[in-house]
């Protein structure tokens, strides 16, 4: 990745782990960024991002990768976000927020929802559910609400590396839309 300039040497990131097999390659960096390459998918994640993608190198890395391999037929691009939301009794909060009272309510353990919104060239899928997570200020796993968003856009041009880079460049716009939507849904 450094040789091709996908992860520039000037960032001084050390590789903490690599896995390389014919169908799968994974590179984990000390910065918290992981690059996963499968036959039909490139995924770049950053585990150390808080408050949006503004300080993350994910879009820059993914854009550099597709520029290095412009001959690949890219069919879609996605910006994905995850938030952990603390609430007292997350299961009860979601049941009260999204489910009408009735006899079905009493024996129900949890409520999870999936919402799908149209985008110009794709769709936004927003999933809200409960789960457990290790929070920075807590020693044990805590019950939380987990929100996952996938802004998926279809590529229509070939070569499409420029279109993929354009879609990846919408990360901050997508984050703002996600934050606003999640705030409106959860409050």
Question: Can you name each region flagged by the protein language model?
Answer:
Residues 1-47:
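N-terminal low-complexity, intrinsically disordered segments
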Residues 88-148:
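Aromatic/basic-lined ligand-recognition segments
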Residues 124-187:
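Mixed-charge, glycine-accented linear interaction segment located at domain edges/termini
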Residues 18-19, 68-88, 105-120, 175-187:
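Short glycine-rich, low-complexity/disordered patches
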Residues 45-85:
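Aromatic- and glycine-enriched beta-alpha-beta binding-site module
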Residues 41, 47-53, 85-87, 151-163, ...:
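A generic structural motif
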Residues 1-9, 58-66, 95-98, 158-173:
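Surface-exposed flexible segments
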Residues 27, 32-41, 45-47, 55-60, ...:
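Amphipathic N-proximal alpha-helical interface segments
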